[in-house]
Each structure stands twice: as C-alpha cells, then as structure tokens.
Amino acid sequence: MPKTINNYNRFLPVVHFSQTELEESLCNAVIHNDKKAAEIAIFKLNISDNFTSDLRTNKSYIDDTHNIFIGDSLPLVAVKNNNLDMLKMLLSCGFEPNTPAAANCYTPLWYVTYKGYTNSVRKLLEYPINNINETFGKETPLKSALIHKHTEIAKLLIDKINPDKFLFNGVENIALLAHDQFMFIINEISTDKKISLFKLCSKNITEHQDFILFGKGEAEINNMHINNTYMLDYLDNNHDDSTTIIGSID
C-alpha cells in the first residue's frame, strides 16, 4: 500500500506518496507526458486494488522543462505540463480535480487560472469542486484571474461559484471591487445570481471596511467607490421588500 504521511496543515488531506514500482511508473508517465504508459499503469493499479486517487509524487523534478515538487498531485503535474489530454484522462479515472499540493498548497484550479489555461479551467469545472473558492494561503482563483486579466476565465469561475460560497473569504474577495474589470464581468451573469452576489458583497463591506481599504492606492479606492455605488444602485432598483440594503464605502 502507498506510504502515508500525516500532514497537520488543516487544508490538506493525508498524503499518499508513490512507493511501489507501479506507482512510480504512473508518476513518471504523467511527469513526462506519456499518456499511454499512464493508462497502462492505472489499469494495472486498478487490477491490483492498489489504486489511490490521491497519489502524489515522492520526489521533485526541477529542470528546463519540469517544475514538479514532492507532494504534487498528478492532476497538478498535468496542468503544470499544460497537458489537457493527460488531465482529462486522470479526471476520468477518478483523480481528485483540485487537491492542494503538499509543498506550497497550489491547486490545479489555482494554477491554471494563474497561467491563463482557459481550456484546462473549463475541464476542471466540469467536475464537482468543493473548495473552488478557498485560498489555501494564496489569492482565490477568481482574484488571480482578475489580477492577471484572464477575463474569460474569470467569467467561467463567476458562473460556476455558488453565490453563497463566493465570499468564503470575505475580506479577500470583497477587495475584488478594486479591480476595474470586476463589474464588467459581473454584468454578464444572471440577475438572480448578481443580486445574491451583490448582497453578500454589501454585507462584507459593512463588516470589513477598514481592512478592505487598508493599503489600497488612490486608483483602487476610486474603483471600489465606483463599483460599490453601481452595486448598491443595482440592488436598490432590483430588490424585493425582504432585502436589506447595506454596505457603503466611506
């Protein structure tokens, strides 16, 4: 069975590092973009009842073409290689789509968002991702998309994220109002989802305003004022009698 190491970081599951010859073969095949060899290794692991969907690399591969660290999940290795076919194969075989890496907490979704790999983002979002908006010590995938101006990816994420989970980290995500593209993208989602999202933004502005504004430059604060005014006007014109409108940036 795979070697198991307990990791006390609350974000990470128990990590299964590759140990057997078959597991090593699978990891090496994914690292070196050998899809056929990876399929054979997975088939043999399934036959031997020794397959785990949380298999990790047990060594680092750092050279001109690889940036793989010990403890990377195999879907993360695939997206680091920008190998969409390998990613599709791993996900179809049951690998978890968004497990954070042991070394640096990178998730496949965060990585492809950061890199701007739109097709890989779209493929990952076809699978249930419970931690879609967690930060794991970094900016959220959505904030990363906005920072790096990956507009199409930001649209995909906003469309996928349940509004109730959108502000999983309220202080982190409400700062999105400082980005000039945020409202442009928000305008393309449905009215009901927009209202839910704006209500959450409004609540978090009220609760965290001092922290939100701390360290922001004049242009960012100006964007926040403009976007927040638009948001409150939209809510004022579209809310029902049960909606409480709160949240202004002073």
From Swiss-Prot:
Matches recorded under Gene3D superfamilies:
Ankyrin repeat-containing domain
Answer yes or no on keyword Repeat. Answer: yes
List, alphabetically, the SUPFAM superfamilies matched.
Ankyrin repeat (SSF48403)
Keywords, A to Z? Answer: ANK repeat, Repeat
ANK repeat copies, ranges:
70-99, 104-134, 137-166
PANTHER family, per the entry:
ANKYRIN REPEAT AND PROTEIN KINASE DOMAIN-CONTAINING PROTEIN, ANKYRIN REPEAT-CONTAINING PROTEIN-RELATED
In its UniProt entry, what is this protein called? Putative ankyrin repeat protein RBE_0623
Question: What is the species listed in this Swiss-Prot or TrEMBL entry?
Answer: Rickettsia bellii (strain RML369-C)
